[in-house]
Amino acid sequence: MTENYQDDTLRIFSLNANRPLAEKIAASVGTELGKSTVRQFSDGEIQINIEESIRGDHVYIIQATNAPVNDHLMELLILIDALKRASAKTVNVILPYYGYARQDRTAKPREPITAKLVANMLVEAGATRLLTLDLHTVQVQGFFDIPVDNLFTMPLFAHYYRQQALVGEEIVIVSPKNSGVQRARSLSEYLDATLAIVDHEEIDGVRQEGYVIGNVAGKKCILVDDILNTGQTLATAAEVLMKNGAQEVYACASHGLLSEGAKATLENAPIKEISITDSVYTTADRQPATLNIISCAELMGEALLRIHENKPMSPLFRLEPKGE
């Protein structure tokens, strides 16, 4: 934590999506959140008022775009516009979770690429830089015409699992789907562990029971994904691993959306512990009993300071948390 950061031109504002994380980030930087109010009229319109001068300042907005996605996105766009009109020197968006990132290509004919549309909206509103965490696909960075820094969560999870002695050849890092192999490989390298994949075949459009590519018999397995929404992907993969002789199953995901029904799905799954970051705020009633939350605040706070002080970001891509 930096105490009383000595630069009055650095200003941090938070909207409604994840104020607890914003407060932690501000504390790690050594400053307080700026004062603003967000109102919603009876017809759903959003109004934002900045309650202090930010003229000539470098402003950082902390806002995830999780559910309600469209409300949180509109809050962000409106505040960007307000800051620009109030003569902020730069408007830097800290987006711990990028909603719509999964719509990054046309999977079917006549589908939109909404991740690109959102990028256009943020830039057009007046954002001058974006800092985000574990994009669904790193190619989304290319949708922007402004600098984008995409931090990774695997070093955070690796640090935690090292503390739990979940390292070495007896540990298998498992991707629950083909598209997540790169993320799983990254964690396996941090933990000196082996790699496996849970795959599924489709016959006549019907998804078949999953099978394992790799050896998990008698091993402790860690499932890795970026987004934990309904929990079904991890739950199904955990069942496949146990059927194939896994000793224990753990899971981690960068963003814990935990939509309705996820708690029951995960508590009924053969998963000993599920780790997520606090990139998305979730209420206690949606958190399964097996949940473990690892804060990304220090990582994002350090990135914010490096941006503000024009320091390189590269050391953060293999961050070793303090106390390692």
From Swiss-Prot:
Q: Where does ATP bind?
A: D43, G44, E45, R102, Q103
- A GO cellular-component term linked to this record: ribose phosphate diphosphokinase complex
Q: Which principal EC class is assigned to this enzyme?
A: transferase
Positions annotated to bind D-ribose 5-phosphate? D225, N229, T230, G231, Q232, T233
Q: Could you mention a single GO BP entry for this protein?
A: 5-phosphoribose 1-diphosphate biosynthetic process
Q: In which pathway does it act?
A: Metabolic intermediate biosynthesis; 5-phospho-alpha-D-ribose 1-diphosphate biosynthesis; 5-phospho-alpha-D-ribose 1-diphosphate from D-ribose 5-phosphate (route I): step 1/1
Q: Listed GO molecular functions?
A: ATP binding; kinase activity; magnesium ion binding; ribose phosphate diphosphokinase activity
List UniProt keywords, sorted A-Z: ATP-binding, Cytoplasm, Kinase, Magnesium, Metal-binding, Nucleotide biosynthesis, Nucleotide-binding, Transferase
Please give the cofactor(s) recorded in the UniProt entry for this protein.
Answer: Mg(2+)
Q: Provide the catalytic activity annotation.
A: D-ribose 5-phosphate + ATP = 5-phospho-alpha-D-ribose 1-diphosphate + AMP + H(+)
Which InterPro entries is this protein grouped with?
PRib_PP_synth_CS, Pribosyltran_N, PRibTrfase_dom, PRTase-like, Rib-P_diPkinase, Rib-P_diPkinase_bac
PROSITE patterns annotated for this entry? Answer: PRPP_SYNTHASE (PS00114)
Q: Where does this protein hold Mg(2+)?
A: H136
Can you say where in the cell this protein is located? Cytoplasm
Q: Which Pfam families match?
A: Pribosyl_synth, Pribosyltran_N
The cofactor binding remark recorded in the entry reads: Binds 1 Mg(2+) ion per subunit.
Q: Which domain of life is it from?
A: Bacteria
Enzyme Commission number(s) of this protein: 2.7.6.1
Q: What does this protein do?
A: Involved in the biosynthesis of the central metabolite phospho-alpha-D-ribosyl-1-pyrophosphate (PRPP) via the transfer of pyrophosphoryl group from ATP to 1-hydroxyl of ribose-5-phosphate (Rib-5-P).
Indicate the quaternary assembly. Homohexamer.
Q: Which family does it belong to?
A: Belongs to the ribose-phosphate pyrophosphokinase family. Class I subfamily.
Protein name per the record: Putative ribose-phosphate pyrophosphokinase 1
The gene that this protein is the product of is prs1
